[in-house]
Regions:
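Recognition helix of helix-turn-helix/homeodomain-like DNA-binding domains
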Residues: 26-42
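DNA major-groove recognition helix of helix-turn-helix/homeodomain DNA-binding modules
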Residues: 26, 43-63
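Generic leucine side-chain signal with a strong bias for well-ordered alpha-helical environments
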Residues: 16-21, 50, 54, 142
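Key DNA-contacting residues within the recognition helix of helix-turn-helix
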Residues: 8, 33-34, 43, 48, ...
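Short basic helix-loop element that most often maps to the first helix and adjoining turn
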Residues: 5-20, 24
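A detector for short, charged/polar N-terminal pre-domain segments
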Residues: 1-2
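Active-site helical microenvironments for divalent-metal-assisted chemistry
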Residues: 62-262
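Residues that mark the N-terminal boundary/hinge immediately upstream of a DNA-recognition element
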Residues: 6, 17, 43-46, 152
Length: 262
């Protein structure tokens, strides 16, 4: 989210008054003043207008440098965990995912966040929940490789179990049936868990890359399919605690998103 200091700095760099910026965004001068003071934050739509009017490259540098979960740090952490020798699948998956996602960026691409940040976050999230399972971590790291990098599941350098999980969460092209896609995932508890962890991260970042309409569609899809996925995860004794945490996290993110977009 853009901060008041970033707005002030970018506005002054362009030689704009608060009144001129307000006119370009379509709000009052008082509103711009409150944004800059941090009294309240701009809406998602106005934030996107600010990025466009003020110059996204200038503003994004501050956001990117201030990221809490930097891929360099997460990668180093995961390598340290995997070096124990107890995670041979995940170690291979980490190297393969970094290679295949190289050069790809997360949305919005103006922020220049490497795509690998996403699967790394998922693996770290799993470990933070106590899920120290080699095949699960490997599947989390590889979950987007087939869909986004054109790699067939059979060509992934991991076991058949991991290949099958990744195949289940990979959306086919053309994507014809949402209900059929989720019906297949729900038959596999580990694939259901991968999808829930993935959705948790995507929900947390959707405000930066989605329009209001896309956010509303994403909320609707999540509320329609994810309760069943979470029930499947919860039915596995070893995943019970993770299911509770993910349910809490997803519900909290949905409630916040619905409040903002209502």
């Amino acid at each position: 989210m853009i901060t008041g200091q970033q707005i002030v700095k970018a506005r002054k760099a362009k030689g704009m008054t608060q009144a001129k910026l307000a006119n370009l965004i379509g709000v009052s001068t008082e509103t711009v003043s409150k944004w800059e003071k941090g009294t309240f934050a701009p809406s998602l739509e106005n934030e996107k207008k600010l990025y466009s009017v003020l110059g996204i490259t200038h503003v994004s540098v501050n956001i990117r440098d201030a990221r809490l979960f930097h891929e360099r740090n997460m990668s180093a952490f995961l390598k340290g965990v995997f070096n124990s020798g107890q995670f041979p699948e995940a170690a291979k998956a980490l190297s393969f995912a970094k290679s295949k996602h190289e050069g790809q960026l997360r949305k919005p691409r103006e922020l220049e966040i490497p795509y690998i940040n996403h699967p790394l976050t998922l693996a770290c999230h799993a470990l933070a929940m106590g899920l120290e399972e080699d095949t699960l971590l490997a599947a989390l790291l590889l979950h987007d490789v087939c869909e986004d990098c054109g790699v067939a599941p059979a060509n992934l350098p991991v076991s058949q179990e991991v290949q099958e999980i990744v195949a289940l969460v990979t959306k086919p092209k053309p994507f014809l049936s949402e209900s059929r896609y989720y019906a297949a995932i729900v038959e596999n508890p580990k694939a259901s868990l991968v999808k829930c962890i993935d959705r948790c991260n995507n929900l947390s970042g959707m405000a930066m890359g989605f329009s209001i309409e896309q956010i509303q569609d994403y909320i609707e899809e999540t509320e329609k399919y994810y309760p069943k996925l979470l029930r499947v995860v919860k039915e596995q004794p070893e995943y019970n605690n993770a299911a509770w945490l993910l349910s809490y996290q997803i519900r909290s993110l949905l409630n916040t998103a619905k409040r903002i977009t209502s």
